[in-house]
Amino acid sequence: MEHQLSPILSEIPPTVPVINGEPMCPVENYLLDPNAMAVCSNHSQIMTQHKMYNTWTCPQYWSQIVFVQVNPGEILTIKADDGSIQNIQGPADVPLIAPTGNLPPIYLPPGYMSQVVEENGIQKIVIVPQTLDYHVPMTAPVQQPFVAAPLLTYPQAPQLLYSPVQGEIPVPSYIQEPQQIPPLPLLPPLPLLPPAATFLFQEHLETYPQGRVNHNQFDERTVKIGEYSKKKIRDRQLGEHKINSTFSDTTLLLNKDIDMPAPPDSLCPYTVDTAPGTNTDNSTSDTYSLNTVLNTCTIDSAPRNMADNIPDTNTTDTITSSSAHTPSISTSNATFCSDNNNNITDSSISNYNQVTYDETHKPPDAKSIPSCTSQSASNPSVSENAHNPSSINDGLRPSDVASISENDHEETEANMGAGDNKQILGENQKKSQSSNASLKEHNTEDRTQPGCFNIEKPVVSNIQTRSATVSWTRKSNEKYDINSSMTHELALSSNGKNGTYKNIYTGNGVTVVLHDLQPCMVYFLRVTTIRNAEHRSVSEVVSFTTPGCEPDPPLAPTLISRTKNSLSLQWKASNDNGSKISSFLLEWDEGKGEDFKSCYSGRLKQHKLFKLNPSTKYSFRLAAKNDFGCSNFSETAVFYTSGKTPPAPLPPKLKEAGIYSLSLEWCAPTNPNPNDTLTYVLEMEEAKSGLGFKPKYNGEDLTCTIRNLQRNTMYKFRIFAYNLEGRSNPSGEVKYTTRPARPGCPNKPYVVGTIHAHQVTIGWDLPKDNGGMNISSYSLEVCENSDSANLWKIIYSGTRQEFLYDDLQAATTYKLRVFCTSPAGQSRPSDVLTIQTPTLPPESCRSQPLRGKTKSKDANLPDNRSVNGKPEAHVRGKKAKGPHQDRKVHPSSEKKCALGSQSMECGSVPARHPPSQCGTPVLTCKGPTCVIVSWEIPKCNGAEIIDYRLQWGQVEDSMHLIYTGPCLRYEVKGLVPATTYFCRVQAVNIVGVGMFGGTAKVTTPGTVPAMVPVLKEVESKVPAKLSSTCIAIRWEEPDCHGSPITGYNIEYGDKKVVTVKRITEYVLKDLQPNTTYRIRIQAINHYGLSPFSPSIRCKTKPLPPEPPQLNCVVYGHQSLRLKWGTVSSKKTLANFINYNVLMEDRSGRFSVIYRGPDVTHKVQKLSEYTEYKFKIQACNEAGEGPESDIYTFTTTKSPPTALKAPKVHPLNNNSCEIKWESLEPIKGDPIVYCLQVTTGKKANQIYKGPNTSFSFSNYHANSRYRFKVCAGRRYETSNGLQELWGPYSPSALFSTYKHHSGHGKGSGSKGKGNHNDKGEKCKTEMSDDTFVLTLLIGFALIAVLCAVAVQYLLIN
């Protein structure tokens, strides 16, 4: 049953802290989670405040306040007394006030625990993850949770409670009944408080009293509660005297498994007398009694170093007293050890000491005061590998480690001084002193032994702006050699000594160079030496500061706004690297693309440049300055000023029309700014579509080809021009049409009707594709079988689709084909139709002479009957078996034949054919651009030749017709020199066209180069400084005409010629400023000089002007007005001059403070009595002129400010005192004052000096005096003592009119006179603010009245 206990809340009895005899806060019972006292290794540090607690001296009630610290990301659930539950999201410090003595229970999520921490007198419950788990069996009885009712007792001495330090022995279950102590006679009555608990530490091998059950399983919650109790004892026993106290029992929960962590290093000898009580174990139903036992607990403390990993064996000797059934009063006399490490325990420190306990139960002496002894002895090791739950990586604080020795030493002295308690008697005091002495000696010896891996604090050297060198030395003791393997971890923090550290180096070296540091930054270092996972040591934290340097390069400036003549820029500051940025330096290229020059220097983060050119590119870069110097420049930012929208361009022109495309070209509009880049948008609308214009091209080119159009279709076009400012107006609309395509070939022709011997009708259909246009004509071609050359001839050309061909011959085969023609061209021929004309019967035959006698077996033929005068023959025939086969009829056939007359004799006529093939033409070069072509006459083939056709071209397969006529010679002109040409000839007669003859080839001879096609001026190639004496030109290389170009002749000015090599750019130098030159060029090759190109006119710019004289016309204490040059009434472009005024800054560099055409400028925001240096520079279109000499001007001293109106105080009947405010000296110069009085229209100076008051007497009665004062600044110069006066103050009125008493006749005058005087004084002293406020109130009243009137009128 003891292993199945449910995790319920346990009650931890607290103590009552008392400081300086006054109660601090009576602690009530805590209701905490059972896991509240578990130790968490990832908590950074828990500081325990050490207090001295004494008995109560006066009655006083206090409330218990507990702060629950909730980590980020966690949720705290609190259940109040009324049953309500509240969730609190971390991070937060939740104060819990318990005036009734019971805090609400805190429910924790699984895997978390609560830990009580006391910092600066405030107890906190820290919610942390549960990370440690102990499994070491210990003999102890398992008890059910029992909450004892609080009893009214006196305040008790500090209890034996220990802080939850890792590595300590847990608290086993030991229950005592609460006892009451009668009030002491020497103390006043105190309020009764709940009892405290006594915790006795027992070894799992101890001998239990009769009736007590031995359990080997411990509850983990008990361990945590025990650690909490040990922490509380340690916090309350520091520096205290031995105090008698009563211990009350505490109900603890035990579980089956628990470890035995090492005991604390600060255990001190003490004696505990237990009170009688009864303990009942529900799991075993055993009852045992401890009523008759008085226990004396003796603790032997032997400190050990935890780093050695050699735990001690804790031995407890228990002796049962023989005096049974004698209840006793339990007291505890505590004598504290003097070890320097016994009073401070930090959960983050990895070195702990272990002690050995001997508990001896002795019978009470006559005085019922238990004795306390302390023995210092070492115990043999029991466990070889004691678990050390503390990790150096879980929040170890080296600063605490470094300060342990000093704090411990101070606390040791305090504890030794507090160890003499007058309440300890006789033997017990002596035993305690001897025990403390021996323990102190042992602890002193242990403290003098060095750690096995102690290292000195790291040394930082060679500290640079962004790097530093860190080195350290390591030590060793006798147990470990310094040469043994070890690892060093160097951790760096930049957010404070207790901030987050980051490991930047791990290795066995002792010197590390740090890189990538930030300038002017404080860094903290610590070194951890690791031998293995259980032996670590941390050095003291060392801090160093990197020096400052110049700022980081800032980001490039950004554009706020722009106009045609201005640009507004802004920028952000970069890292100042330890010194505040004093100014920014903005440079620009002035729109020329050359070297950068300063345009602004100051602290502002924005700047606006004026008087810029429209649509111009400007480049900027930025640098920052501080006391260390100037940073590098930022990246270059490019901005453009605004400009005008371009004018409307001309309509686009048709460059070439295709079947499915149109090529257009256009000209750029007249652009006033040549630097402006134009973009063009071409829009198109298909005619009769009604869809409107749609963009088809967007780019910077001046040509465009639109494809995928429909053939023989009309389209509309217009064009826009764009620049950075917007779109121009559209150009005029133009219409262009795509070309039609050649028609498709017609279908195969067909025969209409019957084929006759001499005629046939041929028909054909329309082609399926007419190419987008109507067919204009059809052509029918025929080819006879008799033509071995298979020549086609056109027999018909027209618009009809049927043709009667009546020039046929009987028994002849013909081939026919047809093609059609449209305005787009000629189609391909159709498929071939083959026909054969039938044979004709003979009309008459001539009798052939017979040779010899013949005998005819045929019957006699009857007489022929003539039909239409011709004999008729009757023939019976059969159908031929095959095509074109005739069968003769036998004379014995039944059919009778009639014989015709004899035929006539005739002669044969030869057939006519196209001409034969021509021969190869003969080519003769007449010159580089002329060739004579001649050829011979071919055979005519029965028909006279009427024409010759000559084809000519540069490619043999692509020649074109250049001549048609009867001549046998043709002269070709306009040829290109040094070029190869091809030609051929064919003859034509009335029958047809003959075949082409052979192809001839000729190459024209070379000659002088062609004329240079393009010559233009290039202004960008000439620097601005040389533009007055130089002109740059560029040209395109012409055709060389068969001989490479070797150079060029450039003619300029008064027929001056410069010969250059084969280049296309040249700069003419040593020209006259502001002069126009006519320039032309010719090319040179082996054959000679080419013609001159068309001339161009170029003008040099005038020389840059000289700087004018700079003068200062107005001196001020904060400004200087400068003037230079003269103002011209007529400003033309030729004499337009800008001026640059430069001023020296703190670094000695001159920067531009004004740029423009004005001749005056006021420099403001200057310091008084300071010398400033200036330069001036004149600029025109030729560039910037030379800078002038340095001009030095000094500002004046600043005058004092105006004083308030003086105050007049009458002294007696004939004198008054005038007072005014005083001013502090200005930069060490004394202040003097001048008092002036005005009577009527006359003003007199009545005082001048350093005083602030003056007595005025002997004034006239019935007069008005006005006093005003001004301050002056007195200083010395080489000319002597000088005075600089400020403005006068407002005047103060003083009236000397006599006033009569109120009961007399002049009482009315007195009142009136007073009223007038006050009114006049108020009028005089009314300030500007009062006047403005009066006006505002008046306007407000008028507005309200108007609003009321308007509303009233509208409602009515």
From Swiss-Prot:
Belongs to the FNDC3 family. Gene3D superfamilies: Immunoglobulins (2.60.40.10). Residues 439-448, 883-894 have a biased composition (Basic and acidic residues). PROSITE patterns: FN3 (PS50853). This is Fibronectin type III domain containing protein 3C1. Residues 1351-1356 are cytoplasmic. It comes from Mus musculus (Mouse). It is a single-pass membrane protein. The keyword Secreted does not apply. The keyword Cytoplasm does not apply. It is found in: Membrane. Keywords: Membrane, Repeat, Transmembrane, Transmembrane helix. Residues 308-341 have a biased composition (Low complexity). GO terms for cellular component: membrane.
